[in-house]
Amino acid sequence: RERGATLIHISTDYVFGGDGNVPRREDDPVRPLGVYGRTKLAGEKAIAEAGCDALILRTAWLYSEFGNNFVKTMLRLTAQTPRVKVVFDQAGTPTYAADLAGAIHRMISSGAYRGNEGTYHFSNEGVCSWYDFAHEIAVLAGLDPARVIPCHSEEFPSPVERPRYSVLDKTKIKETFNLTIPYWRDALERCLERLGAQTAGTAI
């Protein structure tokens, strides 16, 4: 604030509860179910209380060709094991980190962020379950998609409660910054191409 800089804060779809089946808007009520969502929401509130200019970007199901993430885990498991169970009753939208970074770069480099500070949602376009995502990873990587088996969340008991529906409405960010957001399957294909896994069918 003292330097007149704009803060960029990456937040999460997990600030919302899991009820409903309508994409979440930026002004929808928040109700985080777990510690992760609560800490991210606390960060959003701290920024608001500080009174600094900020862009708060809520994203979801983030992955890339770098580090450890769901895509690389599914590539490894599907290549090495005969059956991989993945939940089909949690819906959201994957986000390719390169697309998120590209959107942020455009927002900053164009100068359009000035006067448009606030909270925005960004993920790739479309909706899928974790099972749909894992199945498509196998298909595009040249692995056997029949190894990916759908299951209920109850088959994976966990102390961490996750929202059953956390699709983000991206109308605001698209209209404010004139963004065209790629569909999640197209983004996944680009990531796999960069990993060199689309036709190789090898473990990562």
Residue ranges of model-derived segments:
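Structural signature of the Rossmann-like NAD(P)-dependent dehydrogenase/reductase core
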Residues: 8-11, 55-56, 93, 121
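Amphipathic terminal alpha-helices
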Residues: 184-204
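Residue-level signal for the nucleotide or nucleotide-sugar donor/cofactor binding architecture
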Residues: 27, 34, 92-95, 128, ...
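A hydrophobic C-terminal alpha-helical subdomain
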Residues: 154-176, 181
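Catalytic helix-loop patch of NAD(P)-dependent Rossmann-fold dehydrogenases
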Residues: 2, 6, 15-57, 61-62
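NAD(P)-dependent short-chain dehydrogenase/reductase
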Residues: 45-92, 98-99, 105-106
